[in-house]
Amino acid sequence: MSTSAKTQSAPDQFFSASLAEADPEIAAAIAGELGRQRHEIELIASENIVSRAVLEAQGSVMTNKYAEGYPGHRYYGGCEFVDVAENLAIDRAKKLFGAGFANVQPNSGSQMNQAVFLALLQPGDTFMGLDLAAGGHLTHGATVNMSGKWFKPVHYTVRREDGIIDMDEVAKIAEANKPKLIIAGGSAYSRAWDFKRFREIADSVGAYFMVDMAHFAGLVAGGVHASPVPHAHVCTTTTHKSLRGPRGGLILCNDEALAKKFNSAIFPGLQGGPLMHVIAAKAVAFKEALQPDFKVYAKNVVENAKALAETLRGHGFDIVSGGTDNHLMLVDLRPKALKGNVSEKALVRAGITCNKNGIPFDPEKPFVTSGIRLGTPAATTRGFGVAEFQQVGGMIAEVLNAIAQSSDGQAPLVEAAIRQRVKELTDRFPIYS
């Protein structure tokens, strides 16, 4: 072979070799993950299943492009096509949520929330959020998080008797601490939020009002959850979870001056070049969420969550707050003398994926917990309805009741039988076939 032919073969192979040819180890891991998603029931509330179109956009050549700045104002040339993608994402996000301004560049939920803090707070400023132990989020002032280290968080919580936020108590805490920012939203709160009352409380103490709707944004987009956009100074959301897009963040507001602050906080404040392949995928997901069938999906997510919660209650399980108004629920396992970590592992062995989760006023450590969190978006996306979620609730009850009677937190025969039933159920609702 000539020297010329040899020098040409390397780039030819670089551009033509499949993943399986170039890196069989990673290809095998991806194939394994696809198999897991196909044959397990996904009940982690923060997870979903994206469309093939979203996957295609995220795996596109836009991953090659650097585009520091914003559309029309980049620090690099050659941005005409990524500008098209970002402008489409911005316009679709604004239309989807009825907002005047949108920043689609945050790489994650944590970074979108950090950007709001950077724009509105100074180090040491006081802000309020829902306590992590009551269903809040790390970025809302947990001591281990930047938000809890750089700022002064004060937290509201839920009532012991019913697991619901006491708005009168929120008002008292705000009046006593005069926070500069009040946050509504969390990662494990299953009830509706009173955005109007939160804004009134924020106004009464001169605070900004922020809603982190990362978990329920898809329900807002689908019209089955009240929108915080008319009430909040700023709304943040991840673009995955119930919104069913790629992993990333989004900032929404209706005030141009604030929008400029948030833009500056993202770039150059926190990030450099945005992930243009992810922004393209966000645009695709927002277009999907603007279609009529997304409203059907959102309605089904809530109906399925209520069905799952009621089924578990019927099997003697305690649901924190007594039920759910959205896509998720917390199961209090203490009446069954079970721990969250043991229950999570048993359900995974049975083909049902969920996560251990602290419950309000949980006496257990975070890696043990007294509860599990369940959510319905992913299984709803693959086609499960109320009947299927009633079956799933029964399967969960069988596994948990079996391990409650065992000495080592395992019930191999029951787990194996349920795993076979899970496979039969998931085979009826294939993904990426």
Curated annotation (Swiss-Prot):
InterPro entries (UniProt xref): PyrdxlP-dep_Trfase (IPR015424), PyrdxlP-dep_Trfase_major (IPR015421), PyrdxlP-dep_Trfase_small (IPR015422), Ser_HO-MeTrfase (IPR001085), Ser_HO-MeTrfase-like (IPR049943), Ser_HO-MeTrfase_PLP_BS (IPR019798), SHMT-like_dom (IPR039429)
CDD domains recorded: SHMT
Name of the top EC class for this enzyme: transferase
Record keyword Amino-acid biosynthesis present: yes
Enzyme nomenclature, EC number: 2.1.2.1
Pathway: One-carbon metabolism; tetrahydrofolate interconversion; Amino-acid biosynthesis; glycine biosynthesis; glycine from L-serine: step 1/1
Catalytic activity: (6R)-5,10-methylene-5,6,7,8-tetrahydrofolate + glycine + H2O = (6S)-5,6,7,8-tetrahydrofolate + L-serine
Coiled coil segments of this chain: none
Site, Plays an important role in substrate specificity: residue positions: H240
Localization, UniProt: Cytoplasm
Cofactor(s) this protein requires: pyridoxal 5'-phosphate
Gene Ontology molecular function, alphabetical: glycine hydroxymethyltransferase activity; pyridoxal phosphate binding
Residue numbers binding (6S)-5,6,7,8-tetrahydrofolate: L132, G136, H137, L138
Domain of life: Bacteria
A Pfam family the protein falls into: SHMT
Keyword Amino-acid biosynthesis among UniProt keywords: yes
Example of a GO cellular component annotation carried by this entry: cytosol
N6-(pyridoxal phosphate)lysine PTM sites in chain numbering: K241
Subunit structure: Homodimer.
Protein family: Belongs to the SHMT family.
NCBIfam families: PRK00011.1 (NF000586)
Function description: Catalyzes the reversible interconversion of serine and glycine with tetrahydrofolate (THF) serving as the one-carbon carrier. This reaction serves as the major source of one-carbon groups required for the biosynthesis of purines, thymidylate, methionine, and other important biomolecules. Also exhibits THF-independent aldolase activity toward beta-hydroxyamino acids, producing glycine and aldehydes, via a retro-aldol mechanism.
Cross-referenced PANTHER family: SERINE HYDROXYMETHYLTRANSFERASE (PTHR11680), SERINE HYDROXYMETHYLTRANSFERASE 1 (PTHR11680:SF35)
Protein name, UniProt field: Serine hydroxymethyltransferase
